[in-house]
């Protein structure tokens, strides 16, 4: 292993930094200067054989052989095995101790809370006013998400979406056109100490007063072979409803954004044979008097990423037990489908720049008279039911 401090003492031209995490994790942040490659790509590129390579490739491999290869994963566990395999091939290879999380915590130590928070809040009011703040308030008003007397549990997972949502609610409270309360809730379903510290540090830095409660959800789903991520999400929502109710809240706010909505619409059609959407708000079926709201409903994911990067913020993505020991967590069936849908939309957008807006609007323009069948309150209605009336 090589530590973060030891890495910092090396000159940039003396090593090659390789990020072996999944595409989704890398999308949430990468160590500057790192090259993103899968385990298979790394093993293929650094095969150790120069005989069959062309001149350019051979030269690159010879250059690599003279440099340290430093590999990192999420928390420095699975990268150890890969580093060992590369050492067996003759490379001077190391695993970054603690992985990306270790680097992230080290970066956060050097940031001053007052300065960071002030910049973040200013960016919401100024630079991102149009694309983030105005779309947030539009969703609040258009879908009547916040009402007088509400007590809202803003649910923070530790990612970019929920952290932004928390800051937007703090800004909304400053305007406070009518009285309502917010509580910032973090559920620890079994985070590693390092990941919990990342969440706590970000909350401290952004001056978000969080309520943390613990559960054993990660332990409960760890040995589930089929769709553990789906079961985990369902269980987490139930725990959040319950804790929010204990705090006196009547609503929970989740950080789903515009892109989540349009991807859900297409996934339902292409994989579920149904037309449905992710609603901006809904009543809980299991917790009487509770509602779920999605205030980021109109905000684009690229704008959230731009806000994150502009403020040099670093957040966790998935911090479950699976990412400690498994490289395929992000390839879980449902996640891979969502990635596939993202790619499909991006491909269509090359020819039709309005495709995203059209998908979003499609569920607002459903004509019941032109569908074969539909369901209402669990009852299926067919066009033939009233055809001859």
What is the meaning of each model-derived region?
Residues 21, 74, 254-258, 364:
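Short, well-ordered beta-to-alpha junction loops that form the rim of enzyme active sites
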């Amino acid at each position: 292993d090589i530590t973060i401090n030891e890495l910092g003492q090396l000159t940039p031209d003396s090593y090659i930094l390789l990020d072996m995490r999944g595409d989704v994790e890398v999308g949430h942040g990468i160590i500057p200067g790192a090259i993103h490659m899968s385990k298979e790509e790394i093993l293929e590129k650094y095969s150790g054989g120069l005989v069959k390579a062309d001149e350019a490739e051979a030269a690159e491999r010879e250059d690599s052989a003279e440099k340290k290869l430093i590999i990192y994963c999420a928390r420095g566990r699975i990268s150890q095995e890969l580093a060992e395999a590369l050492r067996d091939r003759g490379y001077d290879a190391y695993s970054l101790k603690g992985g990306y999380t270790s680097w992230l915590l080290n970066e956060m130590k050097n940031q001053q809370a007052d300065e960071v928070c002030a910049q973040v809040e200013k960016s919401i009011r100024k630079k991102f006013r149009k694309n983030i703040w105005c779309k947030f308030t539009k969703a609040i008003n258009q879908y009547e998400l916040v009402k007088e007397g509400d007590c809202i549990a803003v649910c923070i997972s530790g990612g970019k979406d929920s952290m932004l949502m928390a800051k937007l609610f703090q800004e909304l409270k400053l305007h406070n056109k009518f009285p309502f309360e917010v509580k910032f809730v973090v559920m620890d379903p079994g985070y590693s100490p390092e990941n919990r510290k990342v969440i706590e540090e970000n909350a401290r830095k952004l001056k978000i007063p969080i309520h943390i409660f613990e559960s054993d959800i990660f332990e409960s789903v760890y040995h589930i072979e089929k769709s553990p991520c789906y079961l985990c999400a369902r269980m987490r929502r139930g725990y959040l409803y319950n804790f929010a109710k204990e705090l006196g809240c009547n609503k929970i706010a989740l950080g789903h954004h515009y892109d989540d909505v349009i991807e859900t619409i297409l996934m339902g059609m292409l994989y579920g044979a149904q037309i449905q959407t992710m609603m901006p708000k809904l009543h809980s079926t299991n917790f009487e008097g509770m509602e779920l709201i999605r205030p980021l409903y109109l905000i684009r994911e690229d704008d959230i990423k731009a806000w994150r990067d502009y403020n040099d913020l670093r957040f966790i993505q998935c911090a479950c037990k699976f990412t400690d020991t498994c490289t395929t967590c992000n390839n879980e069936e449902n996640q891979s489908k969502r990635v596939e849908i993202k790619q499909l939309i991006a491909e269509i957008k090359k020819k039709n720049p309005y495709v995203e807006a059209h998908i979003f609007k499609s569920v607002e323009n459903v004509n019941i008279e032109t569908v074969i069948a539909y369901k209402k309150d669990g009852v299926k209605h067919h066009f033939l039911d009233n055809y001859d009336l």
